[in-house]
Amino acid sequence: FADGLQNELPDPWLNEHSWAEKTDITYPVTLAGKPYTARLYKLAVTGYEGRTNTLNLFDLDTIDESIVHDGIQFDKTAIAKNLTLFLYPDDSDEDGRILRVYQQYFMVSNAAHLILDEALERGSNLHDLADYATIQINDTHPSMVIPELIRLLMQKGIRMEEAIEIVTMTCAYTNHTILAEALEKWPIHYLQKAVPQLL
């Protein structure tokens, strides 16, 4: 903090000495009608009784940290360069709010792809996805995983009604507060601009 204000500094966690392992696994993500390629990074995390868990992280290879000026001021509309620079960017203007929609969709789309791939590898036929995965949605930020999973299942040839049923059996939702300001609501034109494939 300086002068009563929070100051953020970049954290170069994806440098050559990072514990995050770059993989060859990539997924297509469409934002505002433009195709992007997300890359999976795996980070080993110490777990219970000496076991190891894996934290899956996604990034764009096109991220450009040189666009950061004075703390976290950057061009919020340059998605290819800044999508994952700062999660939960300043949303006091429309560009910041739309960037949040892009970020949320980017994360849930990649997670949904990975969940489906891992279920298929373990023997799922996707009609039985709930036997292979449980998706716990905490608060509203990752809730776009629901329509995204439905969309991806339909792309794989599953009818909409069954895709909805599969996702209903796979997803659980917990909301930790009932305060109105904690419940995200996005104007429909944000979704039409950022993720029209979900509408």
Q: Model-found features: residue ranges?
A:
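A conserved ligand/cofactor-binding region detector
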Residues: 1-199
